[in-house]
Regions:
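Bacterial Sec-dependent N-terminal signal peptides
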Residues: 14-50
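Extracellular glycan-recognition surfaces and repeat-rich motifs
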Residues: 62-84
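Short carbohydrate-recognition loop motifs
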Residues: 76-92, 158-162
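Secretory/extracellular carbohydrate-interaction modules
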Residues: 88-158
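Beta-strand-rich interaction surfaces with strong enrichment in secreted/lumenal proteins
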Residues: 95-102, 172-178, 214, 236
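Ligand-recognition surfaces built from glycine- and aromatic
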Residues: 108-110, 216-255
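Short tryptophan-centered beta-strand motifs in secreted/extracellular beta-sheet-rich domains
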Residues: 111, 182-192, 200-202
């Protein structure tokens, strides 16, 4: 009888140990552990949660996470003193571009870019834009501008024209003047309405310049582009100068 009682006690102890809270996993729980270098900081296990927010900044010390997107001509860009220098040559229709390897959705996109003096009348554009396809594209494009647009905006000799465009759904293009030879923060802010569609705002140095409600939303993701392209819509002559831009940083903050 003693042997049976002893075996029963052992069995009950084993059963209690196997069911202790430390060995049970709740799929809805967040598992944490201490950082060995900072014991007071708790880390959250990403295996149990889904984090939809993303934050990225590229300072252009290199082109990691970017790839060539040049359409015409040679890839005319390199890293120079912590900036991406990108250009297009005169008397060509070169279209020099880089894009992110990854795609992104709702959030705030910011380019820090130096806009130099550009050739008078040149059909050349500095681009900071988001692209999915030809109708799902959101742009900043900066150039000398056609004379008709310059006249309409009463542009001074040291003014350039920035085109802020949604290429479709709906199409909208707004033009404003900016001064050449300056650094700018160009921001595209994509927020979501209650039905999951995007509202996009174009900002220059944090001042809102244009806004539009799009008919598409969060299922459409974009790659981020930096470019200098010779394009016919933005001037009155094939470029006579080598036009360039400097990109100091690109940033994305997801929501």
């Amino acid at each position: 009888m003693k042997n049976i009682f002893k075996k029963l006690l052992i069995f009950m102890a084993l059963l209690l140990f196997s069911c202790s809270p430390d060995n049970l996993t709740n799929e809805n729980e967040t598992i944490t552990n201490s950082d060995s270098n900072n014991p007071g900081i708790l880390k959250t296990s990403t295996s149990k949660i889904s984090n939809t927010g993303t934050s990225k900044i590229w300072n252009f010390d290199n082109l990691t996470e970017w790839e060539d997107a040049t359409q015409v001509g040679n890839p005319n860009y390199w890293i120079e003193n912590g900036n991406l220098r990108i250009f297009a040559n005169p008397n060509t229709w070169e279209r020099s571009k880089v894009k992110t390897i990854s795609s992104f959705a709702a959030g705030t996109y910011r380019w820090t870019v130096f806009v130099p003096e550009m050739g008078v009348g040149d059909m050349a554009s500095i681009g900071a834009f988001l692209y999915n396809n030809d109708t799902h594209e959101l742009d900043f494009e900066i150039g000398y501008g056609k004379q008709a647009i310059r006249d309409q905006l009463a542009a001074e000799p040291d003014d350039l024209i920035v085109y802020m465009t949604s290429q479709g759904y709906p199409f909208q293009s707004v033009q404003k003047k900016i001064k050449r030879g300056q650094w700018y923060n160009l921001t595209l802010q994509l927020t979501l309405t209650s039905n999951g569609r995007y509202t996009v705002s174009w900002k220059i140095n944090d001042a809102i310049m244009a806004t539009v409600q799009l008919s598409y939303g969060k299922t459409t993701k974009f790659k981020i582009y930096c470019s200098v392209e010779n394009l016919q819509f933005i001037g009155d002559q094939i470029p006579q100068s080598q036009n360039y831009a400097l990109f100091d940083a690109v940033e994305f903050k997801g929501i």
